[in-house]
């Protein structure tokens, strides 16, 4: 998995943007980053323009590609040959150059102009992640991938991945009744669940044996993947722009079951 992305100006080694996907304790420290930049300065002279190559420096596994004097670096914690990682880094490179080629040519030195690109990085990486690790052979890999992922990465990314998966799995439904039936069927692929409602504007989903937070003790609501999955599934099924969904009970917090409440207004 990608841990961090660095976008660096070649020659000056100026860091234009650093984007981390992990919780703070897993981020690369200053000394390691300095060593990484030094290694890159020697490596890029041998790098074919547009190609993606990898190397290891100390404990870091690094993917690197360069184009138009901009270096794109991905730090990974597993197989650097992963197709998902290479495609993500390539897409980040292409989108960055597409959006900022004019600004770079006429750059005033203001790094803050690149800050808004973080949202595109998230969209690129986690859309690909969902395709490769969750949507493929669904639901075979859901539980293992999510439980491994949630220990190291920020919860907002789990919700994003869940939503992308829900959107990919859903099909348009003609009625609220058919939605209830389909979402119950979909969730039953990896969890016992109960779907109920008092009217067509609200939906309650109870999961008494939640596989996402099983064995976890936390003061926080821990099922962000399911929260995102349900949100994406409902929005796609009913062609809604957005809905309000919230986990109101969680086994990780000591509740008897996990509960999600969706407001479709």
Predicted regions, residues:
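Acidic, low-complexity cytosolic segments
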Residues: 1-4, 10-155, 177, 181, ...
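Short N-terminal helix-loop-first-beta-strand/juxtamembrane motif that initiates sensory/input modules
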Residues: 1-11, 189-193, 205
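Short beta-strand
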Residues: 54-56, 65, 195-198, 248-251
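A short, glycine/Asx- and small/polar-enriched loop/turn
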Residues: 66-69, 201, 253-258
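Secondary-structure transition/turn motif
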Residues: 76-78, 206-212, 263-265
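Amphipathic interaction/junction segments at domain boundaries or subunit interfaces
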Residues: 146-225, 235-238, 242, 249
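C-terminal edge-of-domain segments
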Residues: 248-265
């Amino acid at each position: 998995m990608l841990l961090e992305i660095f976008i660096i100006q070649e020659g000056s080694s100026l860091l234009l943007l650093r984007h981390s996907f992990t919780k703070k304790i897993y981020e690369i420290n200053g000394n390691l980053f300095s060593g990484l930049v030094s290694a890159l300065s020697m490596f890029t002279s041998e790098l074919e323009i547009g190609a993606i190559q990898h190397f290891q420096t100390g404990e870091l596994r690094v993917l690197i590609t360069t184009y138009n004097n901009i270096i794109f670096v991905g730090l990974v914690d597993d197989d650097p040959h992963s197709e998902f990682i290479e495609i993500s880094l390539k897409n980040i490179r292409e989108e960055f150059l597409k959006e900022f080629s004019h600004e770079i040519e006429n750059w005033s030195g203001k790094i803050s102009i690149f800050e808004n690109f973080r949202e595109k990085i998230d969209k690129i990486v986690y859309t690909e992640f969902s395709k490769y690790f969750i949507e493929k052979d669904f639901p075979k890999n859901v539980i293992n991938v999510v439980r491994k992922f949630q220990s190291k990465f920020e919860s907002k990314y789990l919700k994003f991945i869940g939503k992308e998966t829900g959107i990919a799995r859903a099909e348009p439904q003609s009625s609220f009744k058919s939605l209830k039936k389909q979402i119950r069927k979909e969730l039953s692929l990896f969890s016992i669940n109960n779907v109920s409602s008092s009217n067509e504007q609200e939906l309650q989903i109870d999961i008494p044996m939640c596989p996402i937070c099983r064995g976890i003790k936390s003061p926080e609501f821990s099922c962000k993947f399911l929260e995102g999955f349900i949100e994406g599934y409902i929005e796609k099924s009913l062609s809604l722009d957005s809905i309000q969904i919230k986990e109101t009970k969680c086994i990780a917090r000591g509740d008897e079951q996990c509960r999600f409440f969706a407001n479709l207004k």
